[in-house]
Amino acid sequence: MARSRNRFDRTPFQTAITDLSHDGRGVARRDGEGGKVTFISGALPGEVVVAEPTARSRHFDEAKTVEVLQASPQRVAPRCPHFGVCAGCVLQHLEESQQIVAKQRVLMDNLERIGHVTPQTVLPALVGDTWGYRRKGRFSVRRVEKKDKTLVGFRELDPRFVADLSVCYTVIPQIGEKIPQLAALVEGMDGKRDIPQIEFIAGDDAVALTIRHLQPLSARDEQALVEFAQAHDFAIFLQPGGVDSVHPLWPQEVPLSFRLPKWDVELAFRPLDFIQVNASLNQKMIAHALALLDAKPDDRVLDLFCGLGNFTLPLARTVREVVGVEGDAGLVARARENAQRNGLDNAQFYAADLTQDQRQTAWMRQGFDKLLLDPPRSGAIDVLQQLPLKQFKRIVYVSCHPGSLARDAGYLVNEQGFSLLSAGAMDMFPHTAHVESIAVFEKR
């Protein structure tokens, strides 16, 4: 794909950066206080930079930093040689301690601006491993004829293109240090033009790659994959179609699981299942959530969007009974298997689309003391509007999108009579602009 150039003035300009946007870009107003906003990648608040325009729209412009004339004291040298091109992480130039400060600010701004709520207490930010933490992800794969090579990596800042990566320091080292070998593997395959993506996922004892292929692989290609897996200690899965088409190539039995030692729990999963990306932060997050929920031995807890049972099974070690509800029937099946494997008979699981009417379901009609929920980016407003919320003494809301959390917090506080006791950011994705957070609500 040729890189097109839109017809607008791309002359570099000098400007001062006044703020950091929610997606990690510097914010400038080119014509003074009342000027049009420009979002500038690679720039930090307090800096003076030379930027090159990259896009123009009616309400704002976009640009990239080409020279820093006056640097912020919080600026550091990015570790990654691909910073500024790859979109995998956009905050490596900001000191680590300040990254989470920026994310706290994004969270509080969203709560106030969208939800019109302010927490009584701002929770200290939760942090875990900051390098080599990413145990699940998806690489794009593209054969570039002009370069006569195959690229394997994350998308560039311009999402039309795949970054040509030599290494990735945020991905677990078993994968991040072998990206060139992965690219060479695909380049040597007969079906190199029919492989659009490679997904990776790591348990405590195994690392798996899932190869998406649009046409059947030749016997030669399958053998190349097996030899690569054996040489690098990977498990290889093939995906010729949808999620249900995934099957092992080598070996036939793969022990994919992770352990939560504090609760004596082990969670098994499949190669395309959702798991939390950052293992060290996940364990801290579970302990944090259970403490904030103030879970008691006699409590009955409802866990919505429960997935594999990441919160549900630790809760089952703590409370009298827990009910987990999840929209993905496959994850529900695995959650039940995980409960049985861990000898937990006080955890029930239900498959339900939580964006649809659930008021007549068996689980909805049960009584509970407390609610824990960990919804997708779209939030939980649909199910919150159906729940008999008055029964919950406390609600702990784990969020992967501050905007939807703010909207839902506004509903709970301004329409349902809850207080927002506390909220804080959690750095699940260091060096990215992604904001994970947690909030605690109590009935007034």
UniProtKB/Swiss-Prot annotation:
It comes from Xanthomonas campestris pv. campestris (strain ATCC 33913 / DSM 3586 / NCPPB 528 / LMG 568 / P 25). Pfam families: TRAM, tRNA_U5-meth_tr. [4Fe-4S] cluster binds at C80, C86, C89, C168. It comes from the Bacteria. The active site is at C400. It catalyses: uridine(1939) in 23S rRNA + S-adenosyl-L-methionine = 5-methyluridine(1939) in 23S rRNA + S-adenosyl-L-homocysteine + H(+). Its EC number is 2.1.1.190. Keywords: 4Fe-4S, Iron, Iron-sulfur, Metal-binding, Methyltransferase, rRNA processing, S-adenosyl-L-methionine, Transferase. Catalyzes the formation of 5-methyl-uridine at position 1939 (m5U1939) in 23S rRNA. GO terms for biological process: rRNA base methylation. GO terms for molecular function: 4 iron, 4 sulfur cluster binding; iron ion binding; RNA binding; rRNA (uridine-C5-)-methyltransferase activity. S-adenosyl-L-methionine binds at Q276, F305, N310, E326, D353, D374. Coiled coil: none annotated. This is 23S rRNA (uracil(1939)-C(5))-methyltransferase RlmD. Belongs to the class I-like SAM-binding methyltransferase superfamily. RNA M5U methyltransferase family. RlmD subfamily. Residues 5-67 form the TRAM domain.
